[in-house]
């Protein structure tokens, strides 16, 4: 095979050390290419020694497998001095039964040498920092939701059915009654008086819901859970402020994303943190959709192409695109809502939502590439473009089955 990269290296990374294999030209003209493997500690001093060796050998391209979080210090240390490739382990399976760390580094080096692998997308540092913040905020919000669920289960445990009467038991009314319960008040009539005026009309139901056996043990656990919920809320606010600072240089992209139906400011921040502002890293809209995992895989065999599952993709991006798709399908007189209604009947809700995620991401690629806002085609686009004849046939057929004979006459334009 042809050599694509004259001086390259492959790195197998573990927690304790890194195995580095270089592939460079031999000492004389026409001689065989030279390979050498060295082991370096994973500490910073060892990584610096590795970088010095690679620079001394004139290495220009380095490939490494995405192993947990261990690849990050290696990648970040080398990215300013040479081209770094983060490689997907599924794209470079070696021969079974002959796996060692040294052989893995040699195999990676040979794949890079002949250009047989493609690097994964690693955003630049500003986007990486923004991504760290948005992902951590998502974790904090999820943990707060889990803690609220624990508190709800605790109330059910002691027979307090507050969540059956109050839509948001952590709102003003719910918190007031919870605080009183924790403070020692057990009379349901007194507790019901703490509710907002709109809830007092259901006073008898509220009194019944607040009748239980709430003990000091439950009070201690409830206060602890409320404290954790409040801590998570305060942490989310700090993260929001920090994200606002980091996203300021990319305000134009956030404004573009906000023009898409179903995409909120929070959703726009997460999307930008996952795909970055430089959309040229993805050659086409199809490449972006494939990387994100919102398009079906290609599984052709014996001339047949069965329906394929979507690829794993980026779970953080797929999650927020799913939220945007759910919001978009509920909008009125929009292309995305019409597309959802067109697909949901024959393909089901899940596939229709994935199709909406795909449409949103395709639109984002074109918007970023051309620096233009989202232009909605409207809810009647499908009927005007493809569905008029089909809808006519369907309606005429229904009338025929009901015993009517239909003679269609076009309405003259006024």
Predicted regions and their residues:
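A detector of single, family-specific signature residues
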Residues: 1-414
């Amino acid at each position: 095979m042809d050599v694509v990269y004259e001086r390259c290296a492959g790195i197998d990374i573990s927690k304790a050390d890194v195995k580095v294999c270089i592939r460079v030209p031999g000492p004389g003209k026409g001689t065989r290419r030279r390979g050498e493997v060295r082991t370096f500690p994973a500490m910073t001093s060892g990584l610096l020694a590795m970088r010095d060796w690679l620079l001394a050998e004139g290495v220009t391209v380095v490939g490494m497998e995405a192993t947990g979080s261990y690849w990050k210090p290696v990648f970040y240390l080398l990215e300013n001095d040479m081209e770094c490739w983060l490689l997907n382990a599924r794209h470079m399976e070696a021969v079974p039964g002959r796996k060692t760390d040294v052989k893995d580094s040699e195999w990676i080096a040979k794949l890079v040498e002949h250009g047989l692998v493609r690097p994964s997308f690693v955003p630049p540092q500003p986007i990486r920092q923004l991504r760290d913040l948005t992902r951590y905020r998502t974790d904090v919000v999820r943990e707060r939701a889990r803690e609220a669920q624990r508190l709800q289960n605790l109330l059910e445990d002691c027979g307090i059915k507050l969540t059956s009467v109050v839509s948001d038991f952590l709102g003003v009314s719910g918190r007031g009654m919870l605080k009183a319960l924790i403070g020692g008040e057990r009379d349901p009539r007194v507790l019901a008086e703490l509710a907002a005026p709109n809830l007092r009309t259901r006073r008898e139901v509220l009194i019944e819901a607040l009748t239980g056996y709430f003990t000091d043990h439950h009070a201690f656990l409830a206060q602890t859970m409320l404290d954790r919920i409040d801590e998570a809320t305060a942490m989310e606010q700090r993260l929001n402020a920090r994200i606002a600072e980091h996203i300021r240089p990319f305000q134009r992209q956030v404004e573009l994303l906000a023009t898409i139906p179903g995409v909120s400011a929070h959703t726009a921040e997460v999307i930008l943190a996952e795909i970055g502002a430089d959309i040229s890293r993805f050659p086409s809209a199809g490449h972006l959709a494939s990387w994100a995992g919102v398009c079906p895989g290609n599984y052709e065999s014996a001339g047949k192409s069965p329906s394929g599952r979507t690829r794993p993709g980026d779970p953080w991006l797929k999650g927020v695109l799913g939220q945007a798709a759910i919001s978009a399908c509920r909008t009125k007189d929009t292309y995305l809502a019409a597309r959802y209604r067109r697909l949901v009947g024959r393909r089901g809700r899940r596939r229709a939502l994935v199709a909406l995620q795909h449409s949103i991401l395709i639109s984002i690629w074109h918007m970023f590439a051309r620096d233009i806002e989202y232009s909605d085609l409207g809810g009647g686009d499908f009927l005007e473009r493809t569905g008029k004849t089909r809808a006519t046939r369907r309606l005429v057929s229904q009338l025929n089955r009901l015993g009517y004979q239909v003679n269609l006459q076009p309405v003259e334009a006024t």
